[in-house]
Design a protein with these regions (language model features):
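Non-heme di-metal
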Residues: 1-339
Length: 339
């Protein structure tokens, strides 16, 4: 006997009427800022990657890059946006949102990281699977598989909110140091990190919105009791605790070689704590860490909600929106005759 859905948002429909207009708005927002990985000119950073970064900095970049592509493939693939979440919420507007987010992960972010690896000469089969030989990185992937296996929509969306809003941001914080404090290393690559950060922040918020909507509807139907809320809160707090421990261990791998000039382990761990607190708040939970936002947070938060004014040194090519309307385009015959 099939399981009865616990809420409207978990109930399939043959209609195309959007009951959740916010999901349509977020899908349109994400589509409007889609950026092709090939546009950024990461190849121009080859000199930095090969000669201008010191061994400590290059080690950190290579270590982070060794697992980032795997993250993107899982988050955008069947495990989450490209499969699981669309099945948990079988409504057309939610599936539209899932499709556009999956496309961003698989058709923008993952190729972008691959271009960086190609420039460094690391885009090989061995490189993309070397995380399996590292017990810390392998444990992280095992954790992602575990939460992806859950059939509880609330647990899955909470996990995705953390993965996109905290886990990925640890790597972003590390990379951002190369273009802060007066440093201008790998500027084209960091431009992609800026774009990824905006995208992933949006995805984390979308997952949290799905979480909150689902929980609200379940409660209204009597399918989310006080006891359920206590269990859910405990699950989320444990998830946050495990992620914090994992991230700090992974962060330490980035600094195994001493001498990084652009960011410290303490600063990165502080940023990880800040991001975990932010996601907890999105999920209606109390903060886990009693620390204010640190220096790395300051590098990001102005950019997540505003558009930078480009200058001579700003390599970012992501400060645009495709907001033209086809029906408003006109054909100027006099210009055509000049060709």
């Amino acid at each position: 006997m099939p399981t009865v859905p616990k809420s409207q948002i978990e109930t399939s429909t043959d209609s195309y009427v959007a009951r959740y207009p916010w999901a349509v708005e977020k899908a349109i927002e994400q589509q409007s800022i889609f950026w092709p990985a090939e546009e950024l000119g990461v190849e121009e950073d080859e000199q930095d990657f090969r000669t201008n970064l010191n061994p400590a900095e290059l080690h950190g970049i290579i270590t982070a890059q060794s697992i980032l592509t795997q993250y993107e493939l899982m988050i955008g693939g069947e495990e989450f946006w490209g499969g699981k979440i669309a099945k948990l919420f079988p409504r057309p507007e939610i599936q539209r949102l899932c499709a556009v987010i999956s496309n961003v992960e698989l058709n923008s972010h993952a190729p972008f990281y691959n271009i960086g690896n190609e420039v460094m000469g690391n885009a090989t089969d061995d490189f993309y699977t070397q995380w399996k030989a590292d017990p810390i990185l392998a444990e992280r992937i095992e954790f992602i598989h575990k939460v992806a296996a859950s059939d509880d929509a609330l647990e899955v969306t909470a996990a995705v909110a953390f993965l996109e809003g905290a886990v990925l941001f640890s790597a972003f914080g590390f990379f951002k140091g190369f273009n802060s404090r007066g440093f201008n290393f790998i500027p084209h690559f960091v431009s992609g990190i800026d774009g990824s950060a905006k995208d992933e922040n949006l995805h984390s918020m979308c997952s949290a919105m799905l979480f909150q909507q689902c929980k609200k509807e379940r409660a209204e139907k009597g399918n989310h009791t006080k006891e359920d809320e206590v269990r859910l809160s405990n699950t989320i707090q444990l998830m946050a605790h495990v992620i914090a421990l994992h991230e700090k261990r992974i962060n330490s791998l980035l600094f195994e070689v001493p001498g990084n000039r652009v960011i410290t382990l303490e600063e990165l761990n502080h940023f990880t704590e800040d991001r975990i607190n932010i996601v907890l708040a999105r999920l209606g939970q109390e903060p886990m860490f009693n620390t204010p936002s640190g220096v790395v947070s300051g590098w990001f938060y102005d950019q997540l909600s505003t558009v930078k004014v480009p200058d001579f040194f700003a390599a970012t090519q992501l400060q645009y929106r495709r907001n033209w309307a086809r029906h408003q385009l006109t054909f100027r015959k006099e210009l055509a005759n000049e060709l």
